[in-house]
Amino acid sequence: MNMLTVLSVNIALSTCLITIAFWLPQLNLYTEKANPYECGFDPMSSARLPFSMKFFLVAITFLLFDLEIALLLPLPWAIQMNNINTMMLTAFILVSVLALGLAYEWMQKGLEWTE
């Protein structure tokens, strides 16, 4: 009962904050808000430079494997647990999912830098 109350309050508060976050910026629409600020001067060139999608994919892949390392670091301490099979199965599933994702990205040529 107590957990249900906390969960419902959190969901209601989150919904309220998300609604306010989407509603509030639409009150004052000025063209100056969309322009970049360059120390009071008019912008010399476009501040909205095109972003390389290949770089984005490589960066996201790096972050995923960095997160994998962070998740696998506690394994030496987890070996001391009584149920080592569960720990090894969890680690195997984590590495397998990441390897499948890497293979899929490689097959889609997401890691080739040809631009």
From Swiss-Prot:
EC numbers on record: 7.1.1.2
Keywords: Electron transport, Membrane, Mitochondrion, Mitochondrion inner membrane, NAD, Respiratory chain, Translocase, Transmembrane, Transmembrane helix, Transport, Ubiquinone
One MF annotation (Gene Ontology) recorded for this entry: NADH dehydrogenase (ubiquinone) activity
Pfam families according to UniProt: Oxidored_q4 (PF00507)
Record keyword Calcium present: no
GO biological process: mitochondrial electron transport, NADH to ubiquinone
Listed InterPro entries: NADH_UbQ/plastoQ_OxRdtase_su3, NDAH_ubi_oxred_su3_sf
Class of this enzyme: translocase
GO cellular component: mitochondrial inner membrane; NADH dehydrogenase complex
Name of the protein this chain belongs to: NADH-ubiquinone oxidoreductase chain 3
Protein source organism: Peromyscus slevini
